[in-house]
Amino acid sequence: MDFKQHIKEVADYPKEGISFKDITSLMQNGEVYKKSVDELVAYARERGAELIAGPEARGFVVGCPAAYALELGFVPVRKEGKLPRETVRVSYGLEYGTDILTMHKDSIQPGQQVVILDDLLATGGTIEATIKMIEQLGGVVAGIGFLIELDGLGGRERLEGYDVFSLIRYED
């Protein structure tokens, strides 16, 4: 299926010069949304996933249904202050400053095979922070899957050494 035809591009959003790739148009079509999640499920299964992790908020949009389909647990990766129990945390760089991501300390067991799912790979900063926490807890990153990858922003290069899968790729 050509998933790209179901992504709407919004010019100059969220700021001038940006061509925003809007996944909500894909999600509004139940058949297409299901097929996109099914592709990520197949990828996670191939990679031997024992657990799915996804960064907020759009990682939940693909990660939760994939975990459900695979009958696996889902680990939410959240911004600081959003999880109620003891967490691990990683600071990561943004275009203008830094942010902190967290996950529960008891969410991953040593040696557990974790597949990370998210909506979009751009620079890879959020996923790199997610990887650090998974590995800090002793988990193994078995693969990383995305609906969309924006080539030319260094994300794939930043994740070198990990298996990366994308349903849709946009060149520069």
From Swiss-Prot:
One GO MF term attached to the UniProt entry: adenine binding
Any one GO cellular component localisation term in the record: cytoplasm
Major location (coarse): cytoplasm
PROSITE patterns linked: PUR_PYR_PR_TRANSFER (PS00103)
First-level EC class: transferase
EC nos: 2.4.2.7
Pfam families named among the record's database cross-references: Pribosyltran
Cell location: Cytoplasm
Its biological purpose: Catalyzes a salvage reaction resulting in the formation of AMP, that is energically less costly than de novo synthesis.
Protein's name according to its UniProt entry: Adenine phosphoribosyltransferase
Organism this protein belongs to: Exiguobacterium sp. (strain ATCC BAA-1283 / AT1b)
